[in-house]
Amino acid sequence: MQLTRCCFVFLVQGSLYLVICGQEDGPPGSEDPEHDDHEGQPRPRVPRKRGHISPKSRPLANSTLLGLLAPPGEVWGILGQPPNRPKQSPLPSTKVKKIFGWGDFYSNIKTVALNLLVTGKIVDHGNGTFSVHFRHNATGQGNISISLVPPSKAVEFHQEQQIFIEAKASKIFNCRMEWEKVERGRRTSLCTHDPAKICSRDHAQSSATWSCSQPFKIVCVYIAFYSTDYRLVQKVCPDYNYHSDTPYYPSG
């Protein structure tokens, strides 16, 4: 019987070491230790330095073996202790949103008497205030008016009432000038009516920044341009559904 037990142990040891770790010692008294000491030929023994595991660590070894044999989804069910992973809170989304960028809003007007380029940027700070930035580059003569209006403002020509309309529309917002810079000079270029001649025209370049508060969600830019040979009225509104988390429903 001792030879059969030794063969079984070596066979199992050669195939899987974890099975040996999970084996329990025989019950006390099953073999007589004094009888073994008096044997003439010593019995080959398995080294206990590698194979012996204390009773406290046996469940861990058995669980490791079960974990190798069980599907991945049942490993924590066998161990009985699900992992306590801390829930990661989602990162807070920033409230600052760019309504208009320098490349999103621009107006380029070219006439015989004027060459005008206006670019703008509007940034919503998410706390009821927003910043307005405009750049103006004009060569020639002409009158242009740039204002911030709600989406309900009609696009129409009222040259004789332009001053009244702009004064009324300016009360919709509470704005204050943050920064302004204006540069004026003269620029020479080929005449439009006769390219063989050189004409000198007025050149103006300005930049301005306002800080405003909005009583409504949508902020539109209203441009009105008047000259001797050209008139233009334009209203530009951002895509609110793209910049906002909630859809916009127009009213009024």
Curated annotation (Swiss-Prot):
Q: Which residues are glycosylated?
A: N62, N127, N137, N143
Task: Give me the ranges of the annotated region IV (linker domain).
Answer: 158-166
Q: Where is this region: V (Cys-rich)?
A: 167-252
Q: Name the keywords, alphabetized.
A: Glycoprotein, Secreted, Signal
Chain positions covered by the region annotation Disordered:
27-59
Looking at the record, which segments are called III? 76-157
PTM details?
A: May be proteolytically processed at the boundary between the N-terminal non-conserved and the central conserved domain in neuron-like cells.
Would I find Signal among this entry's keywords? yes
Q: Which GO terms describe its molecular function?
A: signaling receptor binding
Q: Where is the composition biased (Basic residues)?
A: 45-55
| Family annotation (Pfam families) | Neurexophilin
Write out the tissue specificity statement of the associated record.
Brain. Detected in several other tissues.
**Example of a GO cellular component annotation carried by this entry:** extracellular region
In the record, which residues are listed under signal peptide? 1-22
Q: What is its main location?
A: secreted
Q: Where is this region: II?
A: 23-75
Keyword hit for DNA damage: no
Instruction: Report the locations given in the UniProt record.
Output: Secreted
Superkingdom of this protein's organism: Eukaryota
Q: What does the similarity note say?
A: Belongs to the neurexophilin family.
The free-text function statement in the UniProt record for this protein reads: May be signaling molecules that resemble neuropeptides. Ligand for alpha-neurexins.
Protein name, as recorded: Neurexophilin-3
Provenance organism: Rattus norvegicus
Q: List the top taxonomic levels of the source.
A: Eukaryota, Metazoa, Chordata, Craniata, Vertebrata
